[in-house]
Amino acid sequence: MPTIIVTGGSGGIGAEVARLASARGVPVAVHFLQNKRAAEALVEEIVSAGGRALALQADIGREQDVVRLFDTAARELGPVAGLVNSAGVVGALTRVENVTAAALEEVFRVNVIGTILCCREAVRRMSTAHGGSGGSIVNVSSIASRIGGAGEWVHYAASKGAVDSFTLGLAREVAVEGIRVNAVSPGIVATDLHAKAGAPDRLERMAPAIPMKRPGTPHEVAQTILWLLSDAPAYITGSILEIGGGR
């Protein structure tokens, strides 16, 4: 069974993707940056249930780390045929006039450069033009790329807009090389992202603005990602699927 790599796999949407994939018999490389304890606990959970998984540390904004991540995953778990780019940073909620250059650089380094580097390594290994057997890439974007994030995180929204554009371009570039590239665009999802951005009450505060009147769950997003990774949507590439409760 081909391996999938899940960046940002130690928590939230990424962790749920890893759980669902392993339940289907797929070996999973669980990437983490700092939360080693959570990543190793997830791997232990997967292995205890009969799955195969490995926790791998990397800073996806650093080229050498990304190459090492993919090389190790392939060596320890088998050929890589799936990539989920779930890792991302938000930074503090703030208006544009208060954003620092350092904050901008970090958001774009991880959300954009990190995503592109991971996709590059996936293509090098999965593309039939490079001797691979094909595969599927799913980038985790955000509904913020469409609505702009005004008053909260315009800089984050802009980084996800870049992810959307990249997804469309890469999908067309590798369409005849056996690789499908899509993105999911979650709305407000019940993860720790909001607390990390300094707004622990954001889920409750924003719920009334959602037509379904509730935030989504990591499981709901992960199910869509697993579907895109599967062979079921064989004719779908270059799509950005919104998972926002109608927002």
Residue ranges and their predicted role:
Residues S10-G11:
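Conserved glycine-rich cofactor-binding loop
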Residues G78, A175, R180, I236-G238:
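Short, small/polar-rich loop/turn modules that mediate ligand/substrate recognition or access, typified
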Residues C119, S159:
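Active-site helix of classical SDR
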Residues R124, R172-E173, A234:
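Alpha-helical segment proximal to the catalytic Tyr-Lys
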Residues S142:
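Residue(s) in the substrate-gating loop at a strand-loop-helix junction
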Residues R214-I243:
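C-terminal substrate-recognition "lid" of short-chain dehydrogenase/reductases
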